Protein backbone atom coordinates (compact mmCIF):
# COMPACT_ATOMS: atom_id res chain seq x y z
CA UNK A 1 0.00 0.00 0.00
CA UNK A 2 1.27 3.45 -0.87
CA UNK A 3 1.69 5.86 2.02
CA UNK A 4 2.24 9.60 2.05
CA UNK A 5 4.56 9.24 5.01
CA UNK A 6 5.93 12.76 5.07
CA UNK A 7 2.81 14.70 4.25
CA UNK A 8 1.47 15.86 0.91
CA UNK A 9 -0.04 19.24 0.28
CA UNK A 10 -1.83 21.32 -2.33
CA UNK A 11 -0.44 24.74 -3.20
CA UNK A 12 -2.32 27.28 -5.29
CA UNK A 13 -1.97 30.79 -6.59
CA UNK A 14 -4.56 33.35 -7.64
CA UNK A 15 -3.71 35.07 -10.94
CA UNK A 16 -5.98 38.01 -10.19
CA UNK A 17 -6.22 39.55 -6.72
CA UNK A 18 -9.86 40.60 -7.13
CA UNK A 19 -10.87 36.95 -6.82
CA UNK A 20 -8.81 36.37 -3.71
CA UNK A 21 -11.31 38.06 -1.42
CA UNK A 22 -14.09 35.91 -2.88
CA UNK A 23 -12.35 32.65 -2.19
CA UNK A 24 -10.29 32.78 0.98
CA UNK A 25 -11.91 31.34 4.07
CA UNK A 26 -10.92 29.79 7.36
CA UNK A 27 -13.39 26.95 7.80
CA UNK A 28 -12.04 23.44 8.28
CA UNK A 29 -12.42 20.68 5.72
CA UNK A 30 -14.79 18.84 8.03
CA UNK A 31 -17.04 21.88 8.21
CA UNK A 32 -16.94 22.13 4.44
CA UNK A 33 -17.85 18.48 4.04
CA UNK A 34 -21.00 19.06 6.03
CA UNK A 35 -22.29 21.38 3.32
CA UNK A 36 -23.06 18.56 0.90
CA UNK A 37 -26.60 19.86 0.46
CA UNK A 38 -25.17 22.59 -1.79
CA UNK A 39 -25.31 22.07 -5.57
CA UNK A 40 -22.15 20.43 -6.92
CA UNK A 41 -19.20 22.71 -7.57
CA UNK A 42 -18.10 22.55 -11.22
CA UNK A 43 -14.34 22.52 -11.76
CA UNK A 44 -12.43 22.35 -15.04
CA UNK A 45 -8.65 22.00 -15.36
CA UNK A 46 -6.59 22.49 -18.51
CA UNK A 47 -3.27 20.92 -19.39
CA UNK A 48 -1.15 20.83 -22.51
CA UNK A 49 -0.91 17.03 -22.66
CA UNK A 50 -2.76 13.97 -21.37
CA UNK A 51 -1.31 13.49 -17.83
CA UNK A 52 -0.57 17.20 -17.18
CA UNK A 53 -3.80 17.81 -15.28
CA UNK A 54 -3.29 14.57 -13.36
CA UNK A 55 0.08 15.76 -12.09
CA UNK A 56 -1.18 19.25 -11.37
CA UNK A 57 -4.59 18.51 -9.87
CA UNK A 58 -5.00 14.79 -9.25
CA UNK A 59 -5.38 15.27 -5.51
CA UNK A 60 -7.76 18.16 -6.04
CA UNK A 61 -9.95 16.09 -8.31
CA UNK A 62 -10.02 13.22 -5.83
CA UNK A 63 -11.18 15.49 -3.00
CA UNK A 64 -13.87 17.17 -5.06
CA UNK A 65 -15.10 13.89 -6.52
CA UNK A 66 -15.45 12.50 -2.99
CA UNK A 67 -17.73 15.44 -2.17
CA UNK A 68 -19.94 14.72 -5.17
CA UNK A 69 -18.68 17.74 -7.10
CA UNK A 70 -18.07 17.74 -10.86
CA UNK A 71 -14.51 17.80 -12.20
CA UNK A 72 -13.30 17.72 -15.79
CA UNK A 73 -9.75 17.52 -17.11
CA UNK A 74 -9.01 18.81 -20.63
CA UNK A 75 -5.79 18.17 -22.56
CA UNK A 76 -5.27 20.76 -25.29
CA UNK A 77 -3.12 18.41 -27.39
CA UNK A 78 -3.45 14.73 -28.22
CA UNK A 79 0.06 13.87 -27.03
CA UNK A 80 1.10 12.41 -30.39
CA UNK A 81 4.79 13.36 -29.95
CA UNK A 82 5.41 12.18 -26.38
CA UNK A 83 7.10 8.82 -26.82
CA UNK A 84 10.45 7.43 -27.90
CA UNK A 85 9.12 4.80 -30.32
CA UNK A 86 5.40 5.39 -30.94
CA UNK A 87 4.22 8.41 -32.91
CA UNK A 88 1.29 10.02 -34.69
CA UNK A 89 -2.22 8.63 -34.58
CA UNK A 90 -1.15 5.37 -32.97
CA UNK A 91 0.28 7.24 -29.98
CA UNK A 92 -2.59 9.75 -29.90
CA UNK A 93 -5.10 6.89 -29.71
CA UNK A 94 -3.14 5.22 -26.92
CA UNK A 95 -2.80 8.40 -24.87
CA UNK A 96 -6.48 9.23 -25.21
CA UNK A 97 -7.34 5.74 -23.95
CA UNK A 98 -4.97 6.22 -21.01
CA UNK A 99 -6.56 9.57 -20.16
CA UNK A 100 -10.07 8.12 -20.24
CA UNK A 101 -8.93 5.29 -17.96
CA UNK A 102 -7.37 7.80 -15.57
CA UNK A 103 -10.63 9.72 -15.42
CA UNK A 104 -12.59 6.52 -14.87
CA UNK A 105 -10.36 5.56 -11.94
CA UNK A 106 -11.02 8.85 -10.21
CA UNK A 107 -14.65 9.29 -11.21
CA UNK A 108 -14.16 12.46 -13.25
CA UNK A 109 -14.53 13.41 -16.92
CA UNK A 110 -11.50 13.61 -19.18
CA UNK A 111 -11.34 15.08 -22.70
CA UNK A 112 -8.40 15.12 -25.11
CA UNK A 113 -8.54 17.70 -27.91
CA UNK A 114 -7.05 16.84 -31.30
CA UNK A 115 -4.30 19.47 -31.52
CA UNK A 116 -0.79 18.20 -32.25
CA UNK A 117 1.71 17.74 -29.43
CA UNK A 118 4.66 20.14 -29.60
CA UNK A 119 2.85 22.41 -32.05
CA UNK A 120 0.35 24.21 -29.83
CA UNK A 121 0.09 27.93 -30.56
CA UNK A 122 -2.03 30.67 -28.91
CA UNK A 123 -4.38 30.99 -31.88
CA UNK A 124 -7.93 32.30 -31.96
CA UNK A 125 -9.16 28.84 -32.94
CA UNK A 126 -7.75 27.17 -29.82
CA UNK A 127 -8.86 30.06 -27.62
CA UNK A 128 -12.41 29.52 -28.85
CA UNK A 129 -12.11 25.80 -28.09
CA UNK A 130 -11.28 26.72 -24.49
CA UNK A 131 -14.13 29.23 -24.28
CA UNK A 132 -16.53 26.50 -25.40
CA UNK A 133 -15.13 24.01 -22.89
CA UNK A 134 -15.53 26.43 -19.98
CA UNK A 135 -19.03 27.47 -21.03
CA UNK A 136 -20.30 23.97 -21.78
CA UNK A 137 -19.03 22.73 -18.42
CA UNK A 138 -20.67 25.75 -16.73
CA UNK A 139 -17.43 26.06 -14.83
CA UNK A 140 -17.19 27.93 -11.56
CA UNK A 141 -13.49 27.18 -11.08
CA UNK A 142 -10.90 27.03 -13.88
CA UNK A 143 -7.32 25.83 -13.37
CA UNK A 144 -4.36 26.22 -15.73
CA UNK A 145 -0.56 26.52 -15.69
CA UNK A 146 1.19 29.83 -15.40
CA UNK A 147 2.39 31.13 -18.80
CA UNK A 148 6.06 30.55 -17.98
CA UNK A 149 7.52 27.07 -18.44
CA UNK A 150 10.29 25.17 -20.23
CA UNK A 151 7.78 23.60 -22.65
CA UNK A 152 6.09 25.81 -25.28
CA UNK A 153 2.86 23.77 -25.08
CA UNK A 154 2.69 24.41 -21.33
CA UNK A 155 3.36 28.13 -21.75
CA UNK A 156 0.76 28.55 -24.46
CA UNK A 157 -1.82 26.62 -22.45
CA UNK A 158 -1.44 29.26 -19.75
CA UNK A 159 -1.67 32.07 -22.30
CA UNK A 160 -4.73 30.56 -23.99
CA UNK A 161 -6.68 30.09 -20.77
CA UNK A 162 -5.73 33.58 -19.63
CA UNK A 163 -6.91 35.01 -22.96
CA UNK A 164 -10.21 33.13 -22.63
CA UNK A 165 -10.78 34.10 -19.01
CA UNK A 166 -12.82 37.23 -19.66
CA UNK A 167 -14.28 36.20 -22.99
CA UNK A 168 -16.34 33.39 -21.45
CA UNK A 169 -18.88 36.01 -20.30
CA UNK A 170 -19.02 37.98 -23.59
CA UNK A 171 -22.22 36.90 -25.45
CA UNK A 172 -21.19 38.26 -28.86
CA UNK A 173 -18.16 35.94 -29.02
CA UNK A 174 -18.33 32.19 -29.78
CA UNK A 175 -22.07 32.56 -30.26
CA UNK A 176 -22.67 28.84 -30.77
CA UNK A 177 -22.25 28.33 -27.00
CA UNK A 178 -24.19 30.43 -24.44
CA UNK A 179 -21.99 32.80 -22.44
CA UNK A 180 -21.65 32.36 -18.68
CA UNK A 181 -23.60 34.79 -16.55
CA UNK A 182 -20.67 35.30 -14.20
CA UNK A 183 -16.94 34.86 -14.48
CA UNK A 184 -15.41 31.75 -12.89
CA UNK A 185 -12.54 31.82 -10.43
CA UNK A 186 -9.27 31.25 -12.31
CA UNK A 187 -6.32 29.61 -10.53
CA UNK A 188 -2.77 28.54 -11.35
CA UNK A 189 -1.16 25.17 -10.74
CA UNK A 190 1.86 25.31 -8.46
CA UNK A 191 5.30 25.28 -10.08
CA UNK A 192 8.95 25.87 -9.24
CA UNK A 193 9.79 28.46 -11.88
CA UNK A 194 11.31 31.66 -10.50
CA UNK A 195 11.23 33.96 -13.54
CA UNK A 196 9.64 36.37 -14.09
CA UNK A 197 8.49 35.75 -10.51
CA UNK A 198 8.31 32.68 -8.26
CA UNK A 199 5.04 30.90 -7.62
CA UNK A 200 3.12 32.29 -4.63
CA UNK A 201 1.00 29.80 -2.72
CA UNK A 202 -2.19 31.51 -1.56
CA UNK A 203 -3.70 28.30 -0.19
CA UNK A 204 -2.03 25.04 0.80
CA UNK A 205 -4.09 21.96 1.69
CA UNK A 206 -2.99 18.48 2.73
CA UNK A 207 -3.79 15.65 0.30
CA UNK A 208 -2.42 12.79 2.41
CA UNK A 209 -5.83 11.13 2.43
CA UNK A 210 -6.06 10.96 -1.38
CA UNK A 211 -2.42 10.48 -2.35
CA UNK A 212 -2.91 6.84 -3.30
CA UNK A 213 -5.82 7.86 -5.54
CA UNK A 214 -3.59 10.34 -7.33
CA UNK A 215 -0.88 7.74 -7.90
CA UNK A 216 -3.50 5.29 -9.15
CA UNK A 217 -4.58 7.92 -11.66
CA UNK A 218 -1.02 8.56 -12.83
CA UNK A 219 -0.50 4.81 -13.12
CA UNK A 220 -3.06 4.75 -15.95
CA UNK A 221 -0.66 6.77 -18.14
CA UNK A 222 1.63 3.82 -18.85
CA UNK A 223 3.18 5.40 -21.95
CA UNK A 224 4.34 8.38 -19.93
CA UNK A 225 5.31 7.34 -16.42
CA UNK A 226 6.76 3.93 -17.24
CA UNK A 227 8.13 4.56 -20.75
CA UNK A 228 8.58 8.09 -22.11
CA UNK A 229 9.53 10.08 -19.00
CA UNK A 230 11.94 7.43 -17.65
CA UNK A 231 13.47 7.22 -21.14
CA UNK A 232 14.06 10.99 -21.30
CA UNK A 233 15.69 10.83 -17.86
CA UNK A 234 17.89 7.86 -18.80
CA UNK A 235 16.16 5.70 -16.18
CA UNK A 236 14.09 3.32 -18.28
CA UNK A 237 15.92 0.28 -16.92
CA UNK A 238 14.89 1.26 -13.37
CA UNK A 239 11.16 0.82 -14.03
CA UNK A 240 9.93 -2.35 -12.26
CA UNK A 241 8.20 -4.98 -14.38
CA UNK A 242 5.70 -6.00 -11.72
CA UNK A 243 2.59 -3.72 -11.85
CA UNK A 244 2.34 -3.37 -8.06
CA UNK A 245 6.04 -2.64 -7.70
CA UNK A 246 6.08 -0.05 -10.46
CA UNK A 247 3.11 1.77 -8.93
CA UNK A 248 5.01 1.90 -5.63
CA UNK A 249 8.07 3.11 -7.56
CA UNK A 250 5.96 5.82 -9.21
CA UNK A 251 4.71 7.07 -5.85
CA UNK A 252 8.27 7.63 -4.72
CA UNK A 253 9.44 9.50 -7.83
CA UNK A 254 10.32 13.23 -7.79
CA UNK A 255 7.53 13.84 -10.32
CA UNK A 256 5.03 12.74 -7.65
CA UNK A 257 6.64 14.56 -4.70
CA UNK A 258 8.17 18.00 -4.44
CA UNK A 259 10.05 19.45 -1.50
CA UNK A 260 7.80 21.86 0.31
CA UNK A 261 8.81 25.49 -0.04
CA UNK A 262 9.09 27.48 3.23
CA UNK A 263 6.60 30.07 2.02
CA UNK A 264 4.09 27.31 1.25
CA UNK A 265 4.36 26.11 4.84
CA UNK A 266 3.80 29.69 5.98
CA UNK A 267 0.66 29.92 3.85
CA UNK A 268 -0.61 26.65 5.28
CA UNK A 269 -0.07 27.70 8.87
CA UNK A 270 -1.36 31.23 8.36
CA UNK A 271 -4.69 30.13 6.94
CA UNK A 272 -5.06 27.14 9.30
CA UNK A 273 -6.38 24.78 6.69
CA UNK A 274 -5.05 21.78 8.59
CA UNK A 275 -4.37 20.90 12.23
CA UNK A 276 -1.23 22.45 13.69
CA UNK A 277 0.55 19.11 14.09
CA UNK A 278 -0.11 18.24 10.46
CA UNK A 279 1.41 21.54 9.38
CA UNK A 280 4.54 20.99 11.45
CA UNK A 281 5.12 17.45 10.24
CA UNK A 282 4.56 18.08 6.52
CA UNK A 283 7.90 17.92 4.72
CA UNK A 284 6.67 17.54 1.16
CA UNK A 285 4.29 19.39 -1.13
CA UNK A 286 2.44 18.09 -4.14
CA UNK A 287 2.53 19.55 -7.60
CA UNK A 288 -1.12 20.11 -6.95
CA UNK A 289 -3.73 22.74 -6.60
CA UNK A 290 -6.36 23.27 -3.99
CA UNK A 291 -9.79 22.20 -3.04
CA UNK A 292 -12.11 23.63 -0.37
CA UNK A 293 -12.48 27.12 -1.77
CA UNK A 294 -15.20 26.50 -4.32
CA UNK A 295 -17.82 26.12 -1.60
CA UNK A 296 -16.91 29.44 -0.10
CA UNK A 297 -16.85 31.19 -3.44
CA UNK A 298 -20.46 30.23 -4.14
CA UNK A 299 -22.75 33.05 -3.05
Stretches found by the model and what they are:
Residues 79, 147, 191:
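Flexible loop residues that form catalytic
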Residues 83-86, 197-201:
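Short acidic, glycine/proline-rich loop/turn micro-motifs
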Residues 133-179:
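Active-site adenylate/phosphate-handling loop in enzymes that bind or generate adenylated species
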Residues 1-16:
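N-terminal secretory signal peptides that target proteins for export/translocation
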Residues 33-137, 159, 167, 177, ...:
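Active-site rim/loop-helix segments in enzyme catalytic domains that contact anionic ligands
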Residues 39, 170-175, 180-182, 193-197, ...:
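C-terminal accessory domains and tails appended to enzymatic cores
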Residues 69, 181-184:
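A short helix->loop->beta-strand "cap" motif at the edges of active sites that frequently abuts
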Residues 15-31:
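Bacterial N-terminal signal peptides
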Amino acid sequence: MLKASKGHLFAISFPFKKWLVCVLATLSFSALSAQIQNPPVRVIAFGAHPDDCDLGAGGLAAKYAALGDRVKFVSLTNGDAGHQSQHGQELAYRRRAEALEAGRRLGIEYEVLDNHDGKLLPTLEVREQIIREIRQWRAEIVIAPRPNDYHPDHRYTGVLVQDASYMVIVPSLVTDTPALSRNPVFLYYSDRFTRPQPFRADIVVSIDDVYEKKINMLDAHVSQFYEWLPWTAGELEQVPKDPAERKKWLGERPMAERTMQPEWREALEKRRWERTESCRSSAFAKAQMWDLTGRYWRR
